[in-house]
Each structure stands twice: as structure tokens, then as C-alpha cells.
Amino acid sequence: MTRMLIAIFSMLLAGPVAARDGAPRIDEIVWYNIDSYCSFTRADHRFDYNDPESWRWVLFTNFPAGDGADPIESPFMRIDGQLKQLAQTGIRSLDGGAVRSYQSHDANPYLVEVSLLEGERGIESSAFSGVITVSRNGASSEIAYKGDCGA
């Protein structure tokens, strides 16, 4: 009985694999009816407007603050269970889009790169897809995403 309790206690303390190897965990933000400018989900996620359970985001942005403001300059992500607002640190061109670099506002910041590959353009929105990579202390995680930006 004692061995079993020790084994169970050890498993509970171990936490997820990402926590053990030090890689940041990219979590979903569950926010039904979010009023965002850009909303990105995991690439394999099926979004259904009428299903509140499907409103799961890996990155979102607020609407631009004013004329000419960059709506993707300060996105939000949930990393290691905490909602983080990111600050843009750079942009570089990529065939078919761009790679934007960000960092969190922590003393030991998370570094984030988002490849924005342009997809279909509509009257009020543009589709994007790519990869989001989150790094910290030499370890990183990445996910493929899809989504759009616009009103």
C-alpha cells in the first residue's frame, strides 16, 4: 500500500512531459464569442461558430487601437497555463508572408515566433496559417495553426 501511494504521489508531482523537459507548453484559450481582430486555432482544430466548446484559440489579438495601428503587434497567448501579452520585437519577410518575433513581459521572457503565411483574402478578413514556436531557456515547443484577421 505504501509503495502504491508513493508511486501515485510521484506521478502527480512529475507533471506533463513538457514541464519535465523544460519546453514551454502552448495552451488553448477557451473564450466563447471572443471579440478579437485575429483569432488562430490549432491547424487540426474544427471550429463551429454555433458550438461554444469549439471556441479554442492559441493566439488572438485585440482590434487596432487607432488608424494605422498594427493589429498583430501585441497578441495574446496562453503559455504554461498563464495568459501572456506579447510585445513585437521584429518582422522578417518570408516567401508568401512574414515571420514575426515577440517576447513576453516576464523577467525571464518567453520568445515567440509566428510564421504568417497569407491565405485567401475576403472583403473584411484575410486567412493565415503557419507555425508558432515558443522558446525559453533553450527549450522550445511549436504548433501548426490556422485562422484569420479582420472584422
Where are these predicted regions, by residue range?
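Sec-dependent signal peptide recognition
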Residues: M1-I8
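Cysteine-centric segments in proteins
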Residues: R20-A151
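N-terminal signal peptide c-region/cleavage motif recognized by signal peptidases
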Residues: A14-P16
